[in-house]
Amino acid sequence: MFLVGSSSHTLHRLRILPLLLLLQTLERGLGRASPAGAPLEDVVIERYHIPRACPREVQMGDFVRYHYNGTFEDGKKFDSSYDRSTLVAIVVGVGRLITGMDRGLMGMCVNERRRLIVPPHLGYGSIGVAGLIPPDATLYFDVVLLDVWNKADTVQSTILLRPPYCPRMVQNSDFVRYHYNGTLLDGTAFDNSYSRGGTYDTYIGSGWLIKGMDQGLLGMCPGEKRKIIIPPFLAYGEKGYGTVIPPQASLVFYVLLLDVHNPKDTVQLETLELPQGCVRRAVAGDFMRYHYNGSLMDGTLFDSSYSRNHTYNTYVGQGYIIPGMDQGLQGACIGERRRITVPPHLAYGENGTGDKIPGSAVLIFDVHVIDFHNPSDPVEIKTLSRPPENCNETSKIGDFIRYHYNCSLLDGTRLFSSHDYEAPQEITLGANKVIEGLDRGLQGMCVGERRQLIVPPHLAHGENGARGVPGSAVLLFEVELVSREDGLPTGYLFVWYQDPSTSLFEDMDLNKDGEVPPEEFSSFIKAQVNEGKGRLMPGQDPDKTISDMFQNQDRNQDGKITAEELKLKSDEDQERVHEEL
């Protein structure tokens, strides 16, 4: 189309005309009707395609971009922007277009299509354009509007979806990761991050983005979706960008914010559940067992200890895990649930790791602390109840004891109980028959006393665990001492309360035949016990103990004991010392 008095192919006019679009009820559209056969007084407008949504209509002073075909009444084409593959980009209502086009574009929506009939006095008048448009020509235009903006425009941000929980909003100097679809105002797609299989990662307010995007992302929450409309002077302006973004184009971005952090961020802690009576908190050097769910800021799960049905076990504050977790686990209580938000510079940095944690990703861990201990921990003993009467004798190494117990993990998981059996547990203290921590915890008890024992794994089943007991697990025992008997010295199966008879063999040889078979030996020992003169090793089968005693005295294993063979253990020990000397 043409400037008045110019040969350039654009529609122009030198003076500003008021908006004169008037409704008409003609079948062809809008405009001022003329009597039949009379010349048109105004532009006739036919809106033959109106988009469902029209958030904005063209007003005087707006900048528009549109395509058109121009023909005469007989259908002969005199001009077309399509033929030049170039949109018309111009300001409406300031005299740069012929008056008829200025009026015909007013009130138009993006993607609307109109047919305009422009009478000569609103087109090129009685002069026309030499060689192209004859004098007094009525002009027919088919127009589609692709873009509209104004110099007074700002970035328009519309929240499409905002999560109910917003831990933080984007601010200048933050680093963000987001997905986007980018289109022109008419819906033509020019770019999207999804096709590249990765987010767009950048700093905000540092000049790395077009100005409108810098502004449009401010205030967003992780997981939020926004529609951001950017006028060209806050985008790529008069030059456009490559072949995909034309000059003076408004841009529309549909953005999903996945992540936001600031290089100055520290680890953020949120206590979700704190058990009552927290008497100890984890410190650097402790060994901890915990469950966790690890997710990205948008909620995408990247790892979980629950899926492996096994806690994560590690030292805290020793560099075995990412720095953010090392920091975030310190100060936790056993049984506590806490949320640990770790910025990327305290996690896996800009490179990420594997195929589930992208570069520059903020990580969120929902942690349940099962237990922790320190390699220097002793058995922790707490008396729950003690008999009211005086307790003159307490359990010690070598004692034979009977006791009841319940054993669980610190999270309450039940492991074992003596109450599942018909009788209490029986052991000789110090005989290495139970875990070391339990053995220690049972020492110094009164009969009838109840205790709580917390046993660290290095005094229990260690890092490998045992059947039903996880590796590196701290164990909780509730024990009750039922009975206690003095034990025998190491290596002894039987002891006398007083010095034995000087005629011991003769006393054993019941039939006086000079030898003692198993039956006589057993009868003699049992009689000593029944008469209160001596006692067998407690906690053992008496017959088995007596049989072992007989085997020890039957030196030549001929099934009988002679006077030469019979020796007290104290005499044997003395002979051994003499031989060694």
UniProtKB/Swiss-Prot annotation:
Residues bearing attached sugar chains per UniProt: N69, N181, N293, N309, N351, N392, N406
Coiled coil: none
GO cellular component: endoplasmic reticulum; endoplasmic reticulum lumen; membrane; mitochondrial intermembrane space
Binding residues annotated for Ca(2+) 1, in chain numbering: D509, N511, D513, E515, E520
Spans annotated as Disordered: 533-581
Basic and acidic residues bias spans: 555-581
Motif residue range(s): Prevents secretion from ER: 578-581
Ranges where the EF-hand domain occurs: 496-531, 541-576
Positions of transmembrane segments: none
Catalytic activity field: [protein]-peptidylproline (omega=180) = [protein]-peptidylproline (omega=0)
Matches recorded under SUPFAM superfamilies: EF-hand, FKBP-like
Name this protein carries in UniProt: Peptidyl-prolyl cis-trans isomerase FKBP10
UniProt lineage: Eukaryota, Metazoa, Chordata, Craniata, Vertebrata
